[in-house]
């Protein structure tokens, strides 16, 4: 399995992702700069976290218009799994690959607290070991 790691100006933890994929899961991984195109022989795509373009306008909005995103969209439509971590998730929302919008919190202050997640869909390569409705904390 070959995983493409998409890198933007301001991305971080892309090396951590590479390490986990190659050294822990023994998968093949390759970095792809946001101005390039993805080869057709990619089995999964990961958009790492960070602060793409310094989050100058909105988190992920500039990166969502990078040339590589059209490849990510077309590959996702063909069933290639795509994972967005932190800013990568924001890029997926801003690009329209995920539904919804990103909103500022009501206090307009930084918030750091633990939250619980509820598994809504366990029919994905990333959630298939979890149970529908399972609480992740």
Which residue stretches match the model-derived regions?
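N-terminal beta1-alpha1 cap of cysteine-dependent amidohydrolase-like domains
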Residues: 1-84, 92-114, 118, 131-134
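A structural signal for conserved, well-ordered secondary-structure elements
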Residues: 87
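Catalytic core of tubulin tyrosine ligase-like
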Residues: 124-137
